[in-house]
């Protein structure tokens, strides 16, 4: 189409567009009557995100009455939704055309409405997928064209979201769904939704372009236990209201029935039960239902062939016979990959069912597990291949029937954005809390409509902004702590709770363990905890009653935890100030708040706000930083689950070490050995049991210590209580570099399993660095024994061994014969920073420090000093002197140096002929990047690499083995000049080859 409005946008002095917080700001004009007054209006957040949206003008204000064209031809439900919106916004419809009024034209592709084609100005929904639409607002006119009636209805929903206080930006939208069926399966166990909940939900689905509502409540007896019986008259009236509301909102009302609990398959009884199915379906069909589902989930019977045969017969005798019924939907008895597949092959039930069930029937599946973290593309490909069709997803989030104390308030998360290759039907199972389920459902609408552009974080923020208005920021604080569902056994799903806050907490513990200044971070956390309490109190005071009823207990829980978190910070500050009285007072408050939280039905922020209190209660400034401890075990489980020994000293209570239980199992004796980074005076070992299971919990122990890792001395034996609480094993102070915990007894969740296994979430040591412990170490020096005159010699400097100190910096002086060598440069090794300076002829001082803030490793080469051989010499001496190490306490320790001899011999260097590169060209050009390629120069003797230039400026030097390079972060549709030159070892650079081109539009 012609982009005359885009041209105007680019050339007008008044046009201004920028992106901020997901909103597009444009300068807007009032239309019809021109007043010359300009206002700012926002192209607001739209849900779902449109496939294509272009701002094509300045925008305008809709007049108080409009001309409506096409209402007689357009989809009735779309027109009704439009009229309802106009009435709610006090916009009247003119009885006769008024040229000074805004004009809105509405219709479908196959309607004969000339005004619609004119207003669309070449944009059309004709070539879009089903349910697609085009929307153009321009020059005081608004045009909405649907590919079909559903598309027109969805165009109206987008129009409703665009209009704010009668202002509408000038936009050009073409939009269509990624997935054909998008919606909800009301399939949770527990308190069913009320009738009003369902009506409200159905309207919400239509507004967010969700087109499927599967009615399958587990607690509706006529869906499951009484599936043979017809609904009573009172229930039929209720069902009719739901069916009608669904039709009005372009939602397929899918009636689900679960006969598997006691259906009979064979003989007269089987025929009777099949007829019950038909009769039940007929009654719903007569009420307007055109979509049906027969479920075999959560039953004991695994008669795969019979299940499929019932479906096939129903499909032939009812679905296809009717002619206007959508494809039948089913859930097999095995409905997750773990149940369906073994060693990459389908299990017997799944194989038989897949081979038998008719290809036209939609088969639902929940992903790798019943409730799971993700659906990777490989998993969808596997199941789609087994069933030889696109699958239908029943995603068990935000459902909470397996963990009722917690609310699932997060976005769709862990779903591959290419899932539509194998899935064309996507539904989510909501919570029994209908109102709060809308947050996740809102993001599900975005994911399933525009999968490729889905961003879970943006979708989540947008959902809360659109649903909660002035309370949105408070709701984000609350919901951020309630996104992760984890019942600590078989079910885990959703984005982690408050990940940014958890990272700050972890940073605090690291700083405290490393004796770093944490005052700024502590103040920041005080602010976070105060904001949590404030947000929850605001929500309690201002949330609508229907939402507050669903979350009041969790709001109280987060308030309690926030207060406990603040008390936990008070404990830490008191420890730092050595104020015992303040510490004990804060500890009592923190413990009481934790006890209150743990005794509550409500659950929230278990690994963040709750865990922080637990961590603070067990924190001790004498704790030796777990991340500096090397830990080994008698055995570790890394096959059956990820539970290595290192997890027992990672500072994370949610990971754990487990002795090897997969075949061949290691059934004892069990022990853990901790190697400390220095010699410490220790007096306490902390044992934190695994939190999610008692299996392997240590109840008997022996603690031994050693200075050399070979000769151990026992310091304490005893027993521990059989519970999940953190335990401390205290003893008289003793010097130790190694600590071993031997397991003398442990519990099991298996009969006769006592002592077989051992586990630990954390095993930590408390103590203080041994005063006056001698720090020793030795320097390493690496270099070739022979070098030719004129060549460079790389001299590697590092540390062979360091004892009783953590190194954060090294200081070396490299000595060389100034008559034989000339200093060239110093080169950093990975993860370190090197600063080198020639302090006098024959001496280079080399400073090495950590780039990451972590201790430097003991490595033979930490830095390389490059010397150029200038004259022949036999046995020229290289030495490292004045060597020292800076530790984590800011102390400096001297360490022993070393030396080495090198022979410098005469050499005959081959003649170097400098030539330019050949065949310099662009192999790929797009909007932001250009990739160039070339052939090496005709002569390569002495070739060291290549220098690349952009618009006359050097941008990169690369090695001689490279023959391509990508210039990145370019501007679109812009002319650039690229050049390349070859660099040789004699210091010469070839002539430059040049390339001029324009990036893509």
Curated annotation (Swiss-Prot):
The active site is at 298 (proton donor). Changing residue 298 to N: 99% decrease in activity for 4MU-NAG. The keyword Kinase does not apply. Residues 179-469 are annotated as: Catalytic domain. It is an enzyme of class 3 (hydrolase). Changing residue 390 to A: No change in activity for 4MU-NAG. Changing residue 401 to A: Strongly decreases affinity for 4MU-NAG. 99% decrease in activity for 4MU-NAG. Gene3D superfamilies: 2.60.40.680, Chitobiase/beta-hexosaminidase domain 2-like (3.30.379.10), Galactose-binding domain-like (2.60.120.260), Glycosidases (3.20.20.80), Hyaluronidase post-catalytic domain-like (1.20.58.460), Immunoglobulins (2.60.40.10). It comes from the Bacteria. A protein binds at residues 187, 218, 297, 335, 394-396, 401, 429. One of its GO terms (molecular function) is beta-N-acetylglucosaminidase activity. It catalyses: 3-O-(N-acetyl-beta-D-glucosaminyl)-L-seryl-[protein] + H2O = N-acetyl-D-glucosamine + L-seryl-[protein]; 3-O-(N-acetyl-beta-D-glucosaminyl)-L-threonyl-[protein] + H2O = L-threonyl-[protein] + N-acetyl-D-glucosamine. Changing residue 335 to F: Strongly decreases affinity for 4MU-NAG. 99% decrease in activity for 4MU-NAG. Keywords: Coiled coil, Glycosidase, Hydrolase, Signal. Changing residue 297 to A: 99% decrease in activity for 4MU-NAG. Residues 916-1001 form the Fibronectin type-III domain. Residues 1-30 form the signal peptide. Residues 515-543, 573-597 form a coiled coil. CDD domains: cohesin_like, FN3. GO terms for biological process: carbohydrate metabolic process; polysaccharide catabolic process; protein deglycosylation. Its EC number is 3.2.1.169. Inhibited by O-(2-acetamido-2-deoxy-D-glucopyranosylidene)amino-N-phenyl-carbamate (PUGNAc) and streptozotocin. Binds carbohydrates. Capable of hydrolyzing the glycosidic link of O-GlcNAcylated proteins. Can bind and deglycosylate O-glycosylated peptides from mammals. Metal-binding observed in X-ray crystal structures is artifactual. This is O-GlcNAcase NagJ. It comes from Clostridium perfringens (strain ATCC 13124 / DSM 756 / JCM 1290 / NCIMB 6125 / NCTC 8237 / Type A).
């Amino acid at each position: 189409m012609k982009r005359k409005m885009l041209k105007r946008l680019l050339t007008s002095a008044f046009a201004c567009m920028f992106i901020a917080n997901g909103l597009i700001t444009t300068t807007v004009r009032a239309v019809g009557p021109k007043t010359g007054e300009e206002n700012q209006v926002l192209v607001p957040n739209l849900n779902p995100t449109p496939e294509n949206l272009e701002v094509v003008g300045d925008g305008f204000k809709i007049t108080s009455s409009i001309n409506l064209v096409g209402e007689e031809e357009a989809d009735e439900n779309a027109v009704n939704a439009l009229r309802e919106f106009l009435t709610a916004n006090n916009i009247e419809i003119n009885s006769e055309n008024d040229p000074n009024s805004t004009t809105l034209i509405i219709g479908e592709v196959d309607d004969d409405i000339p005004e619609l084609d004119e207003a669309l100005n070449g944009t059309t929904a004709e070539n879009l997928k089903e349910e697609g639409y085009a929307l153009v607002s321009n020059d005081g006119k608004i045009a909405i064209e649907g590919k079909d009636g559903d598309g027109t209805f969805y165009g109206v929903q987008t129009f409703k979201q665009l209009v704010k206080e009668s202002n509408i930006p000038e936009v050009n939208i073409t939009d269509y769904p990624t997935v054909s069926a998008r919606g909800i399966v009301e399939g949770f166990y527990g308190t069913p939704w009320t009738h009003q909940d369902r009506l409200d939900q159905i309207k919400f689905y239509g507004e967010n372009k969700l087109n499927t509502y599967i009615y399958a409540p587990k607690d509706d007896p006529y869906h499951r236990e009484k599936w043979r019986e017809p609904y009573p008259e009172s229930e039929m009236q209720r069902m009719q209201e739901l069916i009608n509301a669904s039709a009005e909102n372009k939602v397929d009302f899918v009636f689900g029935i679960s006969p598997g609990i006691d259906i009979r398959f064979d003989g007269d009884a089987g025929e009777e039960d099949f007829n019950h199915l038909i009769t039940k379906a007929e009654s719903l069909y007569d009420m307007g239902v055109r979509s049906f589902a027969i479920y075999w989930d959560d039953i004991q019977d695994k008669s795969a062939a019979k299940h499929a045969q019932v479906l096939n017969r129903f499909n032939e005798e009812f679905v296809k016979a009717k002619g206007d019924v959508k494809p039948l939907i089913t859930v097999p008895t095995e409905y997750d990959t773990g149940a369906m597949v073994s060693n990459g092959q389908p299990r017997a039930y799944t194989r038989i069912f897949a081979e038998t069930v008719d290809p036209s029937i939609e088969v639902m599946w929940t992903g790798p597990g019943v409730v799971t973290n993700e659906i990777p593309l490989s998993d969808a490909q596997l199941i789609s291949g087994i069933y030889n069709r696109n699958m239908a997803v029943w995603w068990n989030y935000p459902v909470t029937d397996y963990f009722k104390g917690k609310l699932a308030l997060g976005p769709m998360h862990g779903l591959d954005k290419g899932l539509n290759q194998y899935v064309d039907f996507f539904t989510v199972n909501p919570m029994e809390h209908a109102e709060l389920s809308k947050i996740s459902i809102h993001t599900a609408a975005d994911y399933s409509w525009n999968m490729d552009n889905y961003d879970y974080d943006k979708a989540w923020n947008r959902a809360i902004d659109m649903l909660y208005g002035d309370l949105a920021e408070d709701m984000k604080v609350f919901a951020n702590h309630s996104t992760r569902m984890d019942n600590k056994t078989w079910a885990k799903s959703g984005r982690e709770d408050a990940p940014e806050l958890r990272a700050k907490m972890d940073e605090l513990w690291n700083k405290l363990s490393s004796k770093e200044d944490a005052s700024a971070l502590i103040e920041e956390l005080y602010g976070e905890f105060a904001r949590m309490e404030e947000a929850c109190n605001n929500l309690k005071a201002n949330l609508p009653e229907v939402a507050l009823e669903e979350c009041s207990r969790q709001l109280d829980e987060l308030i309690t935890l926030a207060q406990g978190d603040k008390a936990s910070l008070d404990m830490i500050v008191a420890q730092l100030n050595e104020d015992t009285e303040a510490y004990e007072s804060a500890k009592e408050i923190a413990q009481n708040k934790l006890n209150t939280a743990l005794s509550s039905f409500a659950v929230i922020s278990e690994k963040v706000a709750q865990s922080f209190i637990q961590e603070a209660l067990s924190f001790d400034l004498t704790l030796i930083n777990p991340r500096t401890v090397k830990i080994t075990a008698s055995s570790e489980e890394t096959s059956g689950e990820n539970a290595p020994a290192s997890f027992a000293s990672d500072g994370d209570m949610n990971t754990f070490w487990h002795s090897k239980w997969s075949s061949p199992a290691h059934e004892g004796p069990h022990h853990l050995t901790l190697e400390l980074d220095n010699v410490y005076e220790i007096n306490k070992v902390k044992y934190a049991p695994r939190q999610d299971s008692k299996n392997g919990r240590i109840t008997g122990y022996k603690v031994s210590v050693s200075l050399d890792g070979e000769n151990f001395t026992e310091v304490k034996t005893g027993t521990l209580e059989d519970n999940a609480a953190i335990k401390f094993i205290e003893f008289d102070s003793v010097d130790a570099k190694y600590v071993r915990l031997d397991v003398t007894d442990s519990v099991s969740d298996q009969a006769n399993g006592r002592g077989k296994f051992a586990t630990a979430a954390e095993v930590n040591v408390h103590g203080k660095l041994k005063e006056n412990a001698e720090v020793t170490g030795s320097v390493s020096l690496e270099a070739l024994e022979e070098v030719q005159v004129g060549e460079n010699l790389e001299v590697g400097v590092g540390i062979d061994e360091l004892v009783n100190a953590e190194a954060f910096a090294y200081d070396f002086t490299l000595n060389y014969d100034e008559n034989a060598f000339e200093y060239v440069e110093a080169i950093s090794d990975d993860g370190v920073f090197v600063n080198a300076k020639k302090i006098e002829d024959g001496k280079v001082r080399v400073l090495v420090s950590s780039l990451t803030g972590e201790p430097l490793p003991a490595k033979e080469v930490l830095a390389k000093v490059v010397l150029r051989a200038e004259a022949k010499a036999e046995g020229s001496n290289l030495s490292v002197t004045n060597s020292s190490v800076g530790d984590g306490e800011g102390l400096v320790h001297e360490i022993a140096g070393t030396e080495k001899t090198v022979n410098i011999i005469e050499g005959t260097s081959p003649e170097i002929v400098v030539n330019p590169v050949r065949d310099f060209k662009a192999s790929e050009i797009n909007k932001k990047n250009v990739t160039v390629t070339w052939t090496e120069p005709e002569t390569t003797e002495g070739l060291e690499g290549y220098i690349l230039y952009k618009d006359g400026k050097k941008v990169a030097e690369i090695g001689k083995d490279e023959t391509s390079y990508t210039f990145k972060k370019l501007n679109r549709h812009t002319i650039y000049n690229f050049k390349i030159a070859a660099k040789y070892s004699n210091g010469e650079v070839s002539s430059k080859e040049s390339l001029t081109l324009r990036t893509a539009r």
